[in-house]
Amino acid sequence: MHTIRLKDNYIKLGQALKAAGVVESGVDAKFAVQDGLVKVNGQTETQRGKKLVSGDKVEYDGETIVIE
C-alpha cells in the first residue's frame, strides 16, 4: 500500500499514480485510466484529471494508494 500526503487540497489522479510509483510516466497513467484499469473508492474512473482528496483510495494493478 502506498500513502500520499496532500500538500494542497487535492491531487489529480494521474499525478497520484506517478507519485506512488505505480506507473512510470504520465502517458502510462493516461492509458491506464482511459482503459478503465483504475478504481477510485471502488468505482472505475476514466478521468485522469479527477481530483482526489484526503480519504480517497485508488486501486490499480494490485496496488492500493491512500490519499491523506
Please describe what each predicted stretch is.
Residues 1-11:
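A detector for short, charged/polar N-terminal pre-domain segments
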Residues 2-3, 57-68:
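A positively charged, amphipathic N-terminal helix/segment that binds anionic biomolecules
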Residues 9-54:
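A basic, amphipathic helix-loop patch mediating RNA/tRNA/ribosome contacts
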